[in-house]
């Protein structure tokens, strides 16, 4: 929380609409949404913070442009879900409360109770928060509309295959337009 006290030092504080805070398994990440381009002084200040506080800082200009890292060296981020390390990006939707997330995923597994013969569909699967743990023992069809999320699920599927000694399931990524009924039949 040391970063909070430094906000007043920024000359362009009015340029920020909000700050997203992401606590990944191993790092703290701040994503600053900005209305206008950062001043060179503020950019330099944020870079110093990132180094001194050992955090990752990203800038999100608007919804049309991708977020960019202030730091030159950004480590991959992960969050752990029921023993599975899932690689994430600050743009991904992640449940902010890790304990609540663990409970939600465990409850989904309890309700569905998938076994080796089960096939589960995870609609709007995101990066695989529910899909990967469910695929430990069953076949999971993870359906997404976003190319980036499909790629994330495919990446996690490959990880699951490498862990085949502890997994009897399978994770399959599908890109579908979920508002198109015909898309679901293909």
Where are these regions (language model features)?
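Extended interfacial segments that mediate partner engagement and assembly in macromolecular machines
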Residues: 1-16, 23-27
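Short glycine-rich, acidic/polar surface loops and turns
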Residues: 17-18, 74
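Well-ordered beta-strand positions
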Residues: 20-22, 80
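Short amphipathic alpha-helical segments
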Residues: 28-30, 138
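Accessory substrate-recognition/RNA-binding modules or partner subunits associated with SAM-dependent
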Residues: 30-31, 61
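Short beta-strand-to-loop capping motifs
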Residues: 32-36
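Rossmann-like S-adenosyl-L-methionine
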Residues: 37-186
